[in-house]
């Protein structure tokens, strides 16, 4: 969870650290992994300390075995640190090949919500029918982190948070960096819904011609080049696709 404004995974770490660790242990057994590494950004130090304490307590109480190695690391807070390829490189210095998967470099990546769901599925036969998400933004009267049943309409979720205020004119699903604009509240929460955000309309920005300085490529963690937007703007949609 590296998107600004989204804090639902952070709340899960504070409220269900034991379930997360036990779920990670089950995932390790299922995949045959030789170690577990938990990465937490350094703006969540209380979650880091809590996870570390619970891990030590579980080992001490023999709730999980001492072996194999399990480590908890603090990572620099930056976007997109939580993206799986970036996370793998930050923790292990392994590069996932273009078009490849983490498994290609001997890694399986799960977020804390998935780890918790694995534990609940095995321990309580509970199917995945709910999702932790953040409802926030200046257009939301009472921002909250919620656990919502999949299929619940955005309208009901927003109403639970005190309905939209008068400034809300933009509604999106996800974090502010990788949003999906929504044109209606009559859409359901899905498995991938990490947040519902509402803002006032943004002031239009003046668009300037690209001088091809390359700074955007240098700043991009994946080295992506801005070709699709340029081709689309030139009416070359098939080439951009």
Q: What role is predicted for each listed range?
A:
Residues 10-18, 42-47:
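Cofactor-cradling patches in redox/metallo enzymes
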Residues 28-40, 167-169, 227:
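Glycine-rich phosphate/pyrophosphate-binding loops
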Residues 1-9, 139:
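Gly-rich Lys/Arg/Thr-decorated short loops/hinges at beta-loop-alpha junctions or inter-strand turns
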Residues 2-4, 79-82, 178-180:
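Short gly/pro/ser/thr-enriched loop/turn and capping motifs at secondary-structure boundaries
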Residues 192-208, 215-217, 221-241:
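Ferredoxin-type iron-sulfur electron-transfer modules in oxidoreductases and energy-metabolism complexes
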Residues 14-31:
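Histidine-anchored nucleotide/phosphate-binding helix
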Residues 88-91, 162-212:
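Active-site gating/interface segments in enzymes
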Residues 34-154, 160-164:
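Hydrophobic alpha-helical positions that pack around
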């Amino acid at each position: 969870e590296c998107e600004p404004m989204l804090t639902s995974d952070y709340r899960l770490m504070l409220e269900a650290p034991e379930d997360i660790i036990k779920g990670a242990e089950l995932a390790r057994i299922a995949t045959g992994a030789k170690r577990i590494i938990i990465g937490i950004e350094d703006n969540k130090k209380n979650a880091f300390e809590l996870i570390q304490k619970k891990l030590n307590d579980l080992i001490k109480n023999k709730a999980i075995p001492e072996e194999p190695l399990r480590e908890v690391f603090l990572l620099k807070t930056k976007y997109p640190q939580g993206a799986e390829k970036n996370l793998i490189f930050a923790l292990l210095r392994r590069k996932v090949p273009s078009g490849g998967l983490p498994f290609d470099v001997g890694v399986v990546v799960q977020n804390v919500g998935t780890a918790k769901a694995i534990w609940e599925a095995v321990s309580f036969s509970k199917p995945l029918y709910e999702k932790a998400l953040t409802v926030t933004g200046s257009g939301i009267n009472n921002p909250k982190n919620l656990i919502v049943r999949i299929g619940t309409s955005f309208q009901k979720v927003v109403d639970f948070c005190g309905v939209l205020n008068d400034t809300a004119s933009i509604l999106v699903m996800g974090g502010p960096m990788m949003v999906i604009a929504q044109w209606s509240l009559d859409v359901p929460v899905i498995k991938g819904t990490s947040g519902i955000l509402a803002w006032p309309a943004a002031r239009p920005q003046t668009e300037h011609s690209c001088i091809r300085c390359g700074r955007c490529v240098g700043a991009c963690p994946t080295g992506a080049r801005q070709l699709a937007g340029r081709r689309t703007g030139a009416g070359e949609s098939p080439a951009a696709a």
